[in-house]
UniProtKB/Swiss-Prot annotation:
The keyword Nucleotide-binding applies. This is Heat shock cognate HSP70 protein. It comes from the Eukaryota. GO terms for molecular function: ATP binding; ATP-dependent protein folding chaperone. InterPro entries: ATPase_NBD, Heat_shock_70_CS, HSP70_peptide-bd_sf, Hsp_70_fam. It comes from Trypanosoma brucei brucei. It holds the Pfam family HSP70. One of its GO terms (cellular component) is nucleoplasm.
């Protein structure tokens, strides 16, 4: 018999947890060892495949064939600097796969095997699935799985793939801090009072901070920030480096002379002492067999020393908190509760720094740090599998998450046109209209970027596709509709269509080119740092574009004017060589956007007056009501004449991929629709 509902799984870097909604509450399910959390370890030993506690026990003994940290590899390229750095600390081998991804080599049943991170994660998911089946007495087919808030599209899709491999239909990918907020707020959903909650999710391998507004049954994410490569394992690594330095200094033993088995044992001892120092001020690392004379190696550690070794790690945590507050436009006093999630949030130094930042506020301990994420996932699983309305505790609850970075397309001259802005609530759908830059253009390249800078060359390219079959027409006339849709899993789909040609193309952005959280934050910081210079660069680019259009149009009309020109026309066009010279030799010296705009506006006024005079004297003739009013100004009521519209349509072609890009339609507003 198959269970009609769904389970919730917190697939962690170091530990995982599974829960299910039963009897009006979430039940956290213990594994076959009686533990409510399961190590995210898989061991290929003695012709067996072990998962969880049994696998980790082999790691502690230094056995070969034990794989862990799959979450730090999933969705990443082998060439990723993060992967290259982590490889130095892993006892297992990591190689480059066929498509450039990171794969792990193991020996099993006498054969060498290359395993994808998804396959390792699938083993953990399958084990948790079996634990749930033992608890429920039924087969389980559906689940909600959590990921760090800053996981990119590739990592999210890879996690869904792992669920599929494990025999699960993944109903939803949900962000870990959002799931934890549900665990915190489920009992407060009927209070009605709006509360701003900061979720501090410091796990084994990832770190997220989300600021969530809880009001009645609505959980709305206001901002999220994080680091997908920061967690308790970084503390373990710092302790390991300290121990290796001590061994080298006291005994002259270099790391290279230690076996992988001994390094694995030492790493396990470092993790153990880290846990001890969370509730004791003194601990020690003790290990037999390391020293040549058989003497036991002992290194005493104090909590103060651990805090000293990890100063930079803890500082990184606080900086993420401060960035999240800034993104949410909130101050520390706007936060009612700080919810601690993840085993690493137990570290006393971390809690002390948080209390100091939030001016002595009592940190929330009403949710279990190790179980909160699975708790929220189980609630979401209950709702998505049809349980909505069956429980008075879940009826009326709405979950609203956000995108971490602005996404958009490149338009002519390499400008970044944002379609969905950072921290926009998802699921979300936005549509904008664009057009062509050349006459009879039959195709356009849609290039998709994410970032916070106004020029695409400073942002990160996600992918591109060509929309062909466009109806031949004058440039600016075809209507190209571009739609961005971010689903509830945070995965982006881009669709472009041209109505007359009845052509449509779609791109699902689920590749490994999406940014890591570190790259995202760096881009935000750089955008803030260079905001002024970016504005100036954009102003220069637009000034050149606008004035060149006026100059070209004026010269084209002048060719239709019989010579000699009238005295008035000669005076009107006298600015032209000076205007061209300013664009070519002086514009680049201007250092602020306001002064550029003032100069451009002045030249545009002169160009417009000259163009009107030239039209009157040219082959186009003149029309009643369009005469010069004789005062030398332009107050003749035709400031919105056809020539300006023609100039707006006459955007130039840019350099780039060799394909013509799209251009923005200035008069057409974005059409945004929040999809429920």
């Amino acid at each position: 018999m198959t269970y009609e509902g769904a389970i919730g799984i917190d697939l962690g870097t170091t530990y995982s947890c599974v829960g299910v909604w039963q009897n009006e509450r979430v039940e956290i399910i213990a594994n076959d060892q009686g533990n409510r959390t399961t190590p995210s370890y898989v061991a290929f030993v003695n012709n067996e495949v072990l998962v969880g506690d049994a696998a980790k026990s082999h790691a502690a003994r230094g056995s070969n064939g034990v794989i862990f940290d799959a979450k730090r590899l999933i969705g990443r390229k082998f060439s990723d600097s993060v992967v290259q750095s982590d490889m130095k600390h892993w006892p297992f081998k990591v190689e480059e796969g066929e498509k450039g991804g990171a794969v792990m080599r193991v020996e099993h049943l006498g054969e060498g095997m290359l395993l994808q991170p998804e396959q390792i994660s699938a083993r953990v998911l399958a084990y948790l699935k079996s634990c749930a089946e033992s608890y429920l007495g039924k087969q389980v087919a559906k689940a909600v799985v959590t990921v760090p808030a800053y996981f990119n599209d590739s990592q999210r899709q890879a996690t869904k793939d792992a669920g599929t491999i494990a025999g699960l239909e993944v109903l939803r990918i949900i962000n870990e801090p959002t799931a934890a907020a549900i665990a915190y707020g489920l009992d407060k959903a009927d209070e009605g009072k709006e509360r701003n909650v900061l979720v501090f999710d410091f796990g084994g391998g990832t770190f997220d901070v989300s600021i969530i507004s809880v009001s009645g049954g609505v959980f709305e994410v206001k901002a999220t920030n994080g680091d997908t490569h920061l967690g308790g394992e970084d503390v373990d690594a710092a302790l390991l480096e300290h121990a290796l330095a001590d061994i080298r200094n006291r005994y002259g033993i270099e790391q290279g002379s230690l076996s992988q088995k001994m390094l694995s044992k030492l790493r396990s001892r470092c993790e153990e002492v880290k846990r001890v120092l969370s509730h004791s001020t003194v601990g020690e690392i003790a290990l037999d067999g390391l020293l040549p004379d058989g003497e036991e190696y002992v290194l005493k550690l104090t909590r103060a020393r651990l805090e000293e070794l990890c100063t930079k790690i803890f500082a990184r945590c606080l900086s993420v908190v401060q960035r999240a507050l800034k993104d949410a436009s909130m101050k520390v006093e706007d936060i009612e509760d700080v919810v601690l999630v993840g085993g690493s949030s137990r570290i006393p130094a971390v809690q002390a720094q948080l209390r100091e930042l939030f001016r002595g506020k009592q940190l929330c301990s009403s949710v279990h740090p190790d179980e909160a994420v699975a708790y929220g996932a189980a609630w979401q699983a209950h709702v998505l599998s049809g349980g909505y309305g069956e429980s008075s505790r879940t009826a009326g609850i709405v979950l609203l998450d956000v995108v971490p970075l602005s996404i958009g397309v490149e338009v002519d001259d390499g400008k970044f046109d944002v379609i969905i802005r950072r921290n926009t609530t998802i699921p979300y759908l936005a549509t904008k209209e664009y057009s062509t830059v050349d006459d009879n253009q039959s195709e356009v390249e849609i290039q998709v970027f994410e970032g916070e800078r106004p020029l695409t060359r400073h942002n990160h390219r996600l992918g591109s596709f060509v929309l062909d079959g466009i109806t031949p027409a004058k440039h600016g006339e075809p209507t190209i509709t571009v739609t961005f849709s971010v689903d509830a899993d945070g995965i982006l789909t881009v669709t472009a269509a041209e109505e007359l040609g009845s052509v449509t193309k779609t791109l699902v952005v689920e590749n490994s080119e999406r940014l890591t959280s570190e790259e995202v934050q760096k881009m935000i910081e750089v955008a803030q740092k260079f905001a002024l210079t970016d504005a100036t660069a954009l102003a220069r680019m637009e000034a050149t574009e606008r004035l060149t259009q006026w100059f070209d149009r004026l010269e084209a009309v002048m060719e239709t004017v019989p010579q000699p020109y009238s005295e008035k026309l000669q005076k009107r066009i006298a600015f032209l060589p000076h205007g061209k010279e300013w664009v070519g030799t002086q514009l680049h010296t201007y250092t602020d956007a306001a002064s550029i705009e003032a100069k451009v506006a002045k030249i545009e006024r002169l160009a417009k007056r000259a163009l009107k005079s030239a039209r009157r004297e040219g082959k186009d003739g003149w029309a009643p009501g369009n005469e010069d009013n004789g005062s030398g100004d332009d107050n003749d009521g035709d400031d919105n004449s056809d020539e300006e519209d023609e100039l707006q349509r006459g955007r130039g072609v840019t350099e780039g991929s060799g394909r013509s890009p799209i251009r923005k339609r200035d008069r057409i507003e974005a059409i945004n629709a929040n999809t429920e």
